[in-house]
């Protein structure tokens, strides 16, 4: 008559089976073709001149706009930001002041938020997070957000808005 296995062996075997059941199986092992990761364009720095090329004037170009130095691809909102659309004036530039003031006045279509009221700054943060970050992919940053005028690093840069990406995909 066979002796029953000691309990520790059964527990070890059960733990091993459970661990193997919970480990994800790579798709190549499962006989599936791996799908490429769904990624947008690589994140990059934009000068004012480069960003201006994406102002919605060219039919075959994406439409970019920046708020708080973060560049968003708003092409999916072409009816709002494309050529002749109501908010086209915001496209192709950092229009943080205009967004904060809810203004399309050319004097307000700038990155400069100096002199804005607390209420306007709160409105800017609200639109930034609830509209742009919630709806549109981040494709980069304005050079001004990362660098000072003299080329030195901007110590006020906070990477909280930076999307997760692999550096190898950026070059």
Swiss-Prot record:
One of its GO terms (cellular component) is endoplasmic reticulum. GO terms for biological process: MAPK cascade; negative regulation of appetite; positive regulation of MAPK cascade. Gene3D superfamilies: Cytochrome b5-like heme/steroid binding domain. Residues 43-128 form the Cytochrome b5 heme-binding domain. It is found in: Secreted, Extracellular space; Mitochondrion; Endoplasmic reticulum. The cytochrome b5 heme-binding domain was proven to bind heme, although it lacks the conserved iron-binding His residue at position 81. Non-classical progesterone receptors involved in extranuclear signaling are classified in 2 groups: the class II progestin and adipoQ receptor (PAQR) family (also called mPRs) (PAQR5, PAQR6, PAQR7, PAQR8 and PAQR9) and the b5-like heme/steroid-binding protein family (also called MAPRs) (PGRMC1, PGRMC2, NENF and CYB5D2). Interacts with PINK1 and PARK7. This is Neudesin. It comes from Mus musculus. The lineage of its organism: Eukaryota, Metazoa, Chordata, Craniata, Vertebrata. The gene is Nenf.
